Amino acid sequence: MGAMAGSEPMVDDLGAEVPVVRPVRRVVSLVPSLTEAIAATHPELLIAATDWCTHPPGLAVPRVRGTKNPDLRRIAELAPDLVVCNQEENRRIDVERLRAARIPVWVTRIRTLDEAFAALTRLFVVALGTERPSWLPAAEQVWAAPPPEPLRGAVIPVWRNPWMVVGRDTFTGDLARRLGLRLVHADRPNRYPKVSERELVEGVEIAVLPDEPYVFTEFDGPAAFPGIPVALVSGRDLTWYGPSLLTARTTLTDQLTRARHQPAARPGEIPR
């Protein structure tokens, strides 16, 4: 494939050599957070994204299905210089199939805020060959302040039927800690453990319900936490690593504060 000509080997976050063409002019992003980061910084490079890439609003590029089922044939037809993936968001088999088709793939690994800042720097400077985005150091400064004390026991569900929650070694868990939350299920062996309804609320002082991947709403979710403050938050603020980090700390802090000061719902009651 032509994208391999005139390339030089770079090493992605997983240690894989990636023959990156210079200059990079055509990028397909299979990660919503990274799509927003690239579109906000160098929109001219982005030639396709997934159906889940909702930001920035009005993003007008071809879509190549989802993060877990990308249209590999369509991606190959677009002849990208680079495809951007993430270890957690995308499947290894899809990365391998793209590479087998001689398409360069850069995989990021992000499980903490610090890893996010480092991975974003490497993506832009090493993989894309651009300058470090100006919003990155600004976002680092936003999150440099220590977390409020004491930490409050929290649960962050990501699914129900069955209930699944944020556990250990996750970007969302690290971000939550910096907001003053202690995830009560962080000691479990799985990163996103399944829990029973009883386990769901044990030791929980506040429940944080995002609108992705499961769409929790005031009518779907809060009733499972009777007597416990519930914060309904944007999944983008809680789980995305990109320009949203500039405002996410203030937004989430305000939402957590409001939840703690609102009367907790009684059994069967919908929180206001």
Predicted segments — roles?
Residues M1-R272:
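N-terminal ligand-binding lobe of clamshell/alpha-beta domains
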